[in-house]
Amino acid sequence: MEKEQIKSQLLSFTKNVWDFLIVILIAAAIVFPIRKFVFQPFIVSGSSMEPTYYTGDYLIIDELSYRFNQPTRGDIIVFSYPHDVTQKYIKRIIGLPGETVDITNGKVFIEQGDKKFELQEVYLPSNVITNKDRTLALKADEYFVMGDNRMASSDSRIWGPVPTDKIIGRVLVTVFSPKKIFSANLSFSK
């Protein structure tokens, strides 16, 4: 009787292990493709996108949208740094393929054929100055990107445009922002 009870418990344990492994395999089969081809986590490192994003901000990157639509001006993207693809950068799109970006006296101008206009960057605080005068004509597969913290950003003003094939995706959502949570201005009255 004892042998049958041990055998029954062993069979039950083995079945539970197999059931657990099957659940893990099914979960992996669902999660892996989503993680690889649709959404990707990204943790901000550095001050180049302040005050929009801070070091430690945990973001979700949408990798799917740009397979169907082109990136647009103002999108915040994550991309492989063109000179070292192992590094991932986060910046805002300023210039689109075929345009010329002209930075003169702290102002950003966009040339589209015979049209030229000053870029109105409403997402930047009013005290932000765009330094490093530069003019760059973009090819049909290139984007001009800059960080929102213009004084502390290494971007297209320094190392040139981002090729389309280096773009990983656009920022979809901020999941967690330690700086914004822990820097809340708390006051207590007596």
Regions flagged by a language model, labelled:
Residues 2-18, 22, 33, 37, ...:
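Soluble "head" domains of membrane/secretory-pathway proteins
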